[in-house]
């Protein structure tokens, strides 16, 4: 059985780690390099670094922070936030990123996924999807610009399109569950992972180690992303993995 991954996520704004609830009310909680070092020592399987200041305002790539973060890591680093050109990807990979995460730019220009995948390899391209439920239409839709703008793209269509275009991995954030710490949107995630043959990372809702056990028992996703509960030291990567082991879930 494939071993499941636990991936801390750093939302970085103006060079500082921030966290909010349902994409709002961001608070400064520290230095990304310190967090990266802590999670590396904790036994995290990977780290995701999302530069949300670039997503919001089109700032230059924070290459110095990414380089410093990557230097401290012995685990894969995925970087996302406002990546819109092949040159952006080249610079990030050259400064220590192992993978890049594309969101708004991919929805705006789907051929960018194909171009990036062909140049750098499918394994480098992760497509991040901010998914929100529309109760009137009884469906999930993709959001862009840090969860601020809704698109007409159905999530269940988009995941299949990006796989066909060359995406190597999906990062699905359930906006209704983000920061709520009440468990993952397992029914939605289960529908997604049935539609694709590439790894799916689940994000949004992990509030305690048992939520990760439930996630991996009720879906076939490859990894669980965590932010709030790890940053606030409500639990640790090791504690999550210990609960998973007790639940019979293979961990790295």
Curated annotation (Swiss-Prot):
- The main place the protein resides is cytoplasm
Catalysed conversion reaction: 5-[(5-phospho-1-deoxy-D-ribulos-1-ylimino)methylamino]-1-(5-phospho-beta-D-ribosyl)imidazole-4-carboxamide + L-glutamine = D-erythro-1-(imidazol-4-yl)glycerol 3-phosphate + 5-amino-1-(5-phospho-beta-D-ribosyl)imidazole-4-carboxamide + L-glutamate + H(+)
Has keyword Amino-acid biosynthesis? yes
A GO molecular function held by the record: lyase activity
Q: Does the keyword Amino-acid biosynthesis apply?
A: yes
This entry's Enzyme Commission designation comes to: 4.3.2.10
- Taxonomic superkingdom: Bacteria
Q: Which UniProt keywords apply?
A: Amino-acid biosynthesis, Cytoplasm, Histidine biosynthesis, Lyase
Which InterPro entries does the record associate with it?
Answer: Aldolase_TIM, His_biosynth, HisF, IGPS_HisA/HisF, RibuloseP-bd_barrel
Tell me the pathway: Amino-acid biosynthesis; L-histidine biosynthesis; L-histidine from 5-phospho-alpha-D-ribose 1-diphosphate: step 5/9
Top enzyme category: lyase
- Name the Gene3D superfamilies on file: Aldolase class I
Q: Quote the cellular component terms of the Gene Ontology held in the record.
A: cytoplasm
Which residues are catalytic? 11, 130
Q: Spell out the subcellular localization from the entry.
A: Cytoplasm
Q: Which GO terms describe its biological process?
A: L-histidine biosynthetic process
Checking Pfam families in the record gives: His_biosynth (PF00977)
Q: How does it assemble?
A: Heterodimer of HisH and HisF.
Q: Could you say which protein family the record assigns here?
A: Belongs to the HisA/HisF family.
Q: What does this protein do?
A: IGPS catalyzes the conversion of PRFAR and glutamine to IGP, AICAR and glutamate. The HisF subunit catalyzes the cyclization activity that produces IGP and AICAR from PRFAR using the ammonia provided by the HisH subunit.
Q: What is this protein called?
A: Imidazole glycerol phosphate synthase subunit HisF
Q: Which organism is it from?
A: Staphylococcus saprophyticus subsp. saprophyticus (strain ATCC 15305 / DSM 20229 / NCIMB 8711 / NCTC 7292 / S-41)
